[in-house]
A protein has these predicted regions:
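Glycine-rich phosphate-binding loops of nucleotide-dependent enzymes
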Residues: 1-218
Length: 218
């Protein structure tokens, strides 16, 4: 459920909040409570919710939106225009991005294709861990299926995908593990075969928890 604490967890994992307990391990390193800049250098990328407000730069074209993360990390300070375009073109092909020209405004793309540009932005930095918050928010059904396919493809390539969604169908399609939050705490850690609508609803509404003595009664 919205406000249960899942978004806040991803924010702590990306250095936007301080964690009071637990730890975040990535690529063999303890990343707990590092600042955002340091976490990004350990190949962690983040796609926040509401891409129009938090991810895209509407005044810039597609190519510049694609390269933003690399530039901010200092990975591509002197890259030639040709190399920029070649790199973008490869990601465009790999992600089946539908865009007329890399010079087109990012806002000329559909929601699904904007999201692909944002994902490509982090993949271009060699991100191994992707933190996604409602990755298909505001995207049509056909584009959602493409995003699902892309996430599964990335997982099969060895990427770690941690995503928050309010849609149970997305969890069933994409997740091999599901953490259910209730009032800022993890109420359940479900394996793939345990993920179903009824079980998730019981945990996310507090009717059932991992602690039987605290279960609520209907």
């Amino acid at each position: 459920l919205q406000g249960a604490g899942a978004s806040e967890l991803r924010q702590t994992r990306f250095g936007l909040r301080k964690s009071s307990s637990g730890s975040f391990l990535g690529n063999g390193e303890n990343l707990t409570n590092l600042d955002t800049e340091k976490i990004r250098r350990y190949h962690v990328g983040r796609v926040p919710s509401n891409r129009k407000e938090n991810s895209i730069f509407p005044a810039l074209d597609i190519l510049n939106n694609f390269y933003l993360a690399s530039f901010s990390l200092g990975n591509s300070p002197l890259v030639s225009k040709k190399k920029e375009v070649d790199s973008y073109s490869q990601f465009k092909k790999d992600l089946n991005l539908k865009a007329e020209s890399y010079l087109s405004p990012i806002i000329s793309l559909s929601g699904g294709n904007q999201q692909k540009v944002i994902l490509a932005r982090w993949l271009h930095t060699d991100a191994d861990i992707l933190l996604l918050d409602n990755p298909t928010q505001g995207i049509d059904v056909g584009a959602k299926d493409e995003i699902y396919h892309l996430l599964l493809k990335l997982a099969n390539q060895g990427k770690t995908i941690i995503f928050h969604t309010l849609e149970l169908g997305e969890i069933r399609k994409c997740a091999d593990r599901c953490l259910v939050f209730y009032h800022g705490t993890i109420a359940a850690d479900l394996k793939r075969e345990e993920i179903n609508d009824t079980t998730v609803r019981l945990y996310e509404t507090g009717v059932k928890t991992n602690y039987p003595e605290k279960e609520n009664q209907l």
